[in-house]
Amino acid sequence: MRFLQSKLLLIGSGKWPEKIASIVQSQNLVSEITNIAAREFLKLGTKQVELLLQGKTLWIATTPENQLMILEQIKGLRNKVIIEKPIALNLDQLSRLFTHNRISNNKLYVSEPWRHSEIWGKAKNRLTSFSGFKKLQINRGGPIERDYMDPPWDWMQHDLGLLSELLSINDRSLEFQCKFLNNGKNLEIIIESRNQYQIEINLGLFQERTEQWILDDKLFIDFADRDSFNDQPTCNMFKFVCNDEFTSDLESQVWLTSEIITKLEEIKFA
């Protein structure tokens, strides 16, 4: 694989797009960065969009609904597109995302830097080398609340994306239980895989930033401890997307998240 230095178009406003720009610039991964607010991008005409995206990798960092409208706007183009978490807040948005992915010429990839981190590579090797039943507790969240979604949605994809590499979409023994707590500000997810894992995930509102995996009652990973790793996961992910052999398989990437969103939809209408 060969990394191709890219021109980057960032769609979105706020601290996270600014941080993305800072990270990729610090490692000299892009020759040019253009940033535009999502609302301004959605006002552009077809020719303006084509000119703006020409020869660029696209990174969309906005709300799920805005993200879907942008994807609809660019569906006729052929760009690599990084989309941000959360990918959807309900089953309708998820279905629209999958439909777009199937009909679009763009290559979509969900932004999941931890998949490309050294700490996760080592952790995954340890987990897959352990024989026998494993009990895993995951706590992830923080004090931030957004006006357009409840806190669990902010954090859901982080761990489900990683777990999707440990669990198998073809494992018919997988069982899911989901329960909203604290007036929707927290979410408990239980995933059981016969003879392999019992996983309890606690997401949402915490007094302070919390990103811990606890294996058999012992701290296994603390993603919040930035001193415990030396690599740059965001840069690693960007290089992965920008390499000349990059291929996209969005639905496989988010299969576990799709299962949970479907389960939550069942609960809502039960």
Spans of features found by a protein language model:
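Rossmann-like dinucleotide-binding domain that binds NAD(P)(H)
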Residues: G142-Q207
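Short amphipathic alpha-helix with an adjacent loop that forms part of the alpha/beta core around
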Residues: L44-Q54, N125
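Beta-strand-loop-alpha-helix segment that lines the small-molecule cofactor/substrate pocket
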Residues: T57-P64, L68-E112
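Catalytic nucleophile loop
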Residues: P17, Q67, D159
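C-terminal helix-rich "cap/oligomerization" subdomain common to oxidoreductases
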Residues: M1-R2, L8-I11, F41-L44, G55-T62, ...
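A contiguous active-site-proximal alpha/beta segment in oxidoreductase catalytic domains
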Residues: A88-I144
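N-terminal Rossmann-like dinucleotide-binding module
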Residues: M1-K43, L52, A270
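NAD(P)-dinucleotide binding in Rossmann-like oxidoreductases
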Residues: K179-K185, I190-E251
